[in-house]
Swiss-Prot record:
UniProt-recorded name of the protein: Acetyl-coenzyme A carboxylase carboxyl transferase subunit alpha
Main location: cytoplasm
GO annotation, cellular component aspect: acetyl-CoA carboxylase complex
Record's catalysed reaction(s): N(6)-carboxybiotinyl-L-lysyl-[protein] + acetyl-CoA = N(6)-biotinyl-L-lysyl-[protein] + malonyl-CoA
Main EC class the enzyme belongs to: transferase
Keywords: ATP-binding, Cytoplasm, Fatty acid biosynthesis, Fatty acid metabolism, Lipid biosynthesis, Lipid metabolism, Nucleotide-binding, Transferase
InterPro entries with a match to the protein in the record: Acetyl_CoA_COase_a_su (IPR001095), ClpP/crotonase-like_dom_sf (IPR029045), COA_CT_C (IPR011763)
Record pathway: Lipid metabolism; malonyl-CoA biosynthesis; malonyl-CoA from acetyl-CoA: step 1/1
Length: 335
């Protein structure tokens, strides 16, 4: 079993984990019955882990969402897909490995599944570009979604990206146009679309496959217009203020559900999805099946109309009767 990667705020668990491993080694190397001690330590570790994860700040949730052992798109595909055939290429000479897709079936129901894919180590992350898709990735995604629309396949998307790749080559190849085209075309698809934020949901990179009839989020996932680090650098010119930015951006599932941005927050196992990936997979599978059962009862016209309405009402603003009222709400700037 791979060694668990503990985050900074999980450090109180380090000593307990060491003791648990020592007892397990003792049990393997001798005939001493240590089951009672092992049970006590594991129970204590579980209780402390639950206490820690019940009070996570938005900045800490970002760390969980970025955890290197968090289940990825391909992990979930393998967990609950009866069969899976990956489809490649954007039909324009590229095959972006940061955004993958293919046809599979869930309980004998054929679906198109696509999502961002990060790597587990440095070598794989270089191949996957750390989950940051280039224009070709979004064009591949659109090709696959149009294929699904043609053959009446429900679309499942899995969002896990810090953002679309912002390098010079991506701009030269039309990153903005590729994402904008996806947004426009997804509003016109006549099949159900269920999107899930399984890790990071960053900026336009997430939106490029995020126009959906139902948008779900795991409990410790994040969905944001910009990374807190970028936001802090822009607003305060200090990336160290990222924790404050994370709180102000309202990036957690609880906040976004209250704002009407997402439709459901999926609970995670104690310690996050990386501690019990199979439990996370079962939770996601049940949620997807529930929403698909509802959406498949709707006509094509109803799907398009409801999807349009869902996004049309997003966003809020405050009206003031006069300009003085607006300025009175702005704190004075120090010299």
């Amino acid at each position: 079993m791979a060694k668990r990667y503990l985050l900074d705020f999980e450090k109180p668990l380090v000593e307990l984990e060491k003791q648990i491993e020592q007892i397990k080694e003792l049990a393997r190397d001798s005939e001493v019955d240590v089951s009672q001690q092992l049970l006590q330590l594991e129970t204590l570790a579980t209780r402390r882990r639950e206490e820690i994860f019940k009070s996570l700040t938005p900045a800490q949730k970002i760390q969980v969402a970025r955890h290197p052992q968090r289940p990825s798109t391909l992990d979930f595909v393998q967990m609950f897909c009866d069969d899976w055939i990956e489809l490649h290429g954007d039909r324009n000479g590229g095959d972006d490995m940061a955004l993958i897709g293919g046809i599979g079936s869930i309980n004998n129901r054929p679906v198109l599944m696509l999502g961002h894919q990060k790597g587990r180590d440095t070598k794989e992350n270089v191949v996957r570009n750390f989950g940051m898709a280039k224009p070709g990735g979004y064009r591949k995604a659109l090709r696959l979604m149009q294929h699904a629309d043609r053959f009446s396949l429900p679309i499942l998307t899995f969002i896990d990206t810090p953002g679309a790749y912002a390098g010079l080559t991506a701009e030269e190849q039309g990153q903005g146009e590729a994402i904008a085209r996806n947004l426009r075309e997804m509003f016109g698809l006549t099949v159900p679309i269920v999107a899930t934020v399984i890790g990071e949901g960053g900026s336009g990179g997430a939106l490029g496959i995020g126009v959906a009839d139902r948008l779900l989020m795991f409990e410790h996932s994040v969905y944001t217009v910009a990374s807190p680090e970028a936001c802090a650098s822009i607003l305060w010119r200090d990336a160290a203020k990222a924790p404050e930015a994370a709180s102000a951006l309202k990036i957690t599932g609880k906040d976004l559900l209250k704002l009407g941005i997402i439709d459901e927050v999926l609970p995670e196992p104690s310690g996050g999805n990386n501690w019990a990936p199979l439990d996370a997979g079962n939770t996601l599978k049940e949620a997807i099946e529930k929403h698909l059962d509802t959406l498949l009862q709707m006509t094509k016209d109803e799907l398009i109309e409801e999807r349009y309405k869902k996004f049309r009402v997003l966003g809020k603003f405050i009206e003031a009767n006069n300009i003085e009222e607006i300025y009175s709400e702005i704190p004075p700037q120090s010299e």
